[in-house]
Amino acid sequence: AGIDAGGPHLYETDPSGAMMAYKAGGIGAGRNEVMEVFEKEYKDNMSEAQAVTLGLKGLSAANENNLKPEVVEIAIINPEKEFHTLNSDEVAKAVKKVK
């Protein structure tokens, strides 16, 4: 995952070596639940806040709607290629929105 002059990019390589590009994705346990949420609710040109909420909705679906803010970390890379993380209060507020 990353961002360059062409915009944001998210890739997954499967065990056979095939590479797939996604606009939103999840891996690991709960992937199917996450991808179902993303496929229904993802929209191009989402705001940063909308993207965070969508990601948390996916995580919540994968965790049987029992998402705990103390186990969530959120990092953002914006179009200006600036990286930042949300602090624990910001994460708790974002998680509360999806409950």
Regions found by a protein language model. Give the residues of each.
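Long, low-complexity N-terminal extensions
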Residues: 1-99
